Design a protein with these regions (language model features):
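Transmembrane alpha-helical segments that form core, pore/gating elements
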Residues: 5, 9, 103-157, 248-258
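Membrane-interface helix termini and inter-helical loops of multi-pass transporters
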Residues: 17-20, 49-53, 93-96, 100, ...
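Helix-helix packing/entry segments at the starts of transmembrane helices
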Residues: 58-63, 130-140, 179-214
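Hydrophobic transmembrane alpha-helices of multi-pass small-molecule transport proteins
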Residues: 83-99, 112, 223-242
Length: 258
């Protein structure tokens, strides 16, 4: 994705808009930090998918909206009602069930929401446009990533050694599939409350969960199922509370207009 972003932006944006963030070190640091976080997030996800941990990624992204909500309340002082507290408690209970049973924290299921929620919080503080922000997230990390890829290829254990050329080309350009939703997320992170972003976060883990069970046939044991159910209860409480809160705001707004 970095190659695509870094190629498209200079063609579609005036140079003054591209270099403007360089004048603000704080903003530049925010964007580079966001790039590091999302890279770590993606790397964890890719490792998990390739090591039979798809259900853990689904679990992590179910928890992620609650982390986003918590950061929204702590950092941006967004209202933190009782339904949000209950939802986070249920999510914590789900993680605790896995901890007690497996005698270790579900690392993937915690790394993904923590890194992505922090990424969302940083993006909300970025002043640059969504695409320019993505450009700086990628441009400073590209040399490191390219050096790593070259090292793996020269060592004989890179993608070229494992797949044919057509698949390798698809891998190189698959970043475009990621660029579009991430650009849209960047727009949403700047213009929507983190609570709203959190609710929309349910779609991805649901699709991932279904793929893990129905397509890749990962083992869903009783303990993991119970953990999912506990977290789903928390999400139901959270969603219901958000809907009622939204309706209340609309009702008050309507009365004020009258």
């Amino acid at each position: 994705m970095g190659l695509i972003v870094c190629s498209i932006v200079p063609l579609g944006y005036p140079m003054k808009d591209i270099v403007a963030p360089l004048k603000d070190r704080k903003q530049l640091a925010l964007m580079v930090s966001a790039g590091v976080l999302i890279t770590f997030n993606w790397s964890t996800y890719i490792w998990a998918v390739n090591n039979g941990q798809i259900l853990q990624t689904s679990l992590g992204y179910y928890i992620e909206p609650l982390f986003v909500c918590a950061l929204g309340s702590l950092i941006f002082k967004e209202v933190f009602h009782i339904h949000k507290i209950l939802a986070i408690c249920f999510a914590a209970a789900g993680v605790l069930i896995l901890l007690v049973y497996f005698h270790e924290l579900p690392k993937v299921a915690l790394i993904l929401p923590i890194t992505f929620a922090t990424y969302a919080a940083l993006k909300k503080k970025v002043k640059a446009s969504a695409v320019i922000s993505l450009y700086y997230e990628n441009i400073f990390l590209m040399p490191i990533v390219i050096a790593y890829i070259v090292h793996r290829e020269l060592a004989g254990n890179g993608a070229l050694a494992a797949v044919d050329l057509k698949i390798y080309i698809l891998l190189l350009f698959s970043g475009f599939v990621t660029f579009v939703p991430l650009a849209l997320f960047a727009v949403g992170a700047k213009n929507l409350p983190l609570v709203t972003l959190g609710i929309t976060g349910y779609l991805s883990p649901t699709i991932t969960f279904l793929i893990g069970i129905l397509v890749l046939h990962e083992n869903l044991n009783k303990v993991l199922l119970i953990a999912f159910l506990v977290i789903w209860v928390g999400l139901i409480i959270f969603t219901r509370g958000e809907i009622l809160e939204h309706r209340g705001k609309l009702s008050v707004r309507g009365k004020d207009e009258d």
